[in-house]
Amino acid sequence: MGRKIMVVTAAYGAEQVRQAGGQRAMLPVIAGAGADGVEIRRELFNSEELLALPALSESIELMGLLACYSAPAALFMPDGTLNPDLPRYLSEANTLNALWLKVSLGHFSDTQPLDALRALLNASGMALVVENDQTDCGQLAPMRRFQAACREMALPVTLTFDMGNWLWVGDSPEEAAHHLAPAVSYIHVKAAVPHKDNFRAVAPDRADARWLDLLGQLPADAPRGIEFPLEGADLTAVTRHYVNLLREE
């Protein structure tokens, strides 16, 4: 079947997901579009849904989908220590039978906490991927420092490469791909176009060829996650269009 295509539930918009009945209600759309899996977003859960992860995991499996789990949290706190909530997020990812947990980098300063991180990951058995976010901590320089430290310490932590986020922090996506591609295990696909004083995310076929070209700089076998807005009267058809596009590109 080739590379795996994941659909990020947030691509449908938080309000749309809420009105549909939560992330579980989006699974038939995602499965019906022919996607391989779903990225579940912790920030889209209400308190009751967060307690119902086993049922969500069962639904994902029944739909024949893979899962990954995204927590809106930084790996490192402002003082450089590991996020104390990381064990909880790893446990939730395990409950979902997720392939990996995704977090942002946060305030990485030195390698001292990495041995503790290794122990946590060994204990949980969960893979961890770190994403470049839209904060200063997600700039290319700190991401390179972290990736180099992981390589030096043989720490099994890889990167999520969010194609569009580099523009939000003033970096070149192409330069980032040049430096980070070997460590990338997951790609958040989205294009970004100027909007007022900033940028907004759009589908890659609604922007210039730069974005699809950028995919060519990244590992061909890395799963691709659809994170640009998915909108329209027939969400299954819209999703299917982009699943097919990203599988072929």
Predicted features and spans:
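Hydrophobic residues within beta-strands of alpha/beta enzymes
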Residues: 38-39, 101-103, 128, 187, ...
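Histidine-acidic metal/acid-base catalytic patches
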Residues: 1-34, 97, 140-161, 167-249
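Short secondary-structure transition/capping segments
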Residues: 50-53, 80-82, 113-116, 141-143, ...
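Short, electropositive alpha-helical surface patch
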Residues: 56-67, 120-127, 220-221, 236-249
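N-terminal pre-domain/capping segments
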Residues: 1-87, 94, 249
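Active-site acidic/histidine proton-transfer and metal-coordination neighborhood
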Residues: 62-67, 75-158, 168
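Active-site beta-loop-alpha junctions enriched in small/polar residues
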Residues: 10-14, 41-45, 70-76, 106-108, ...
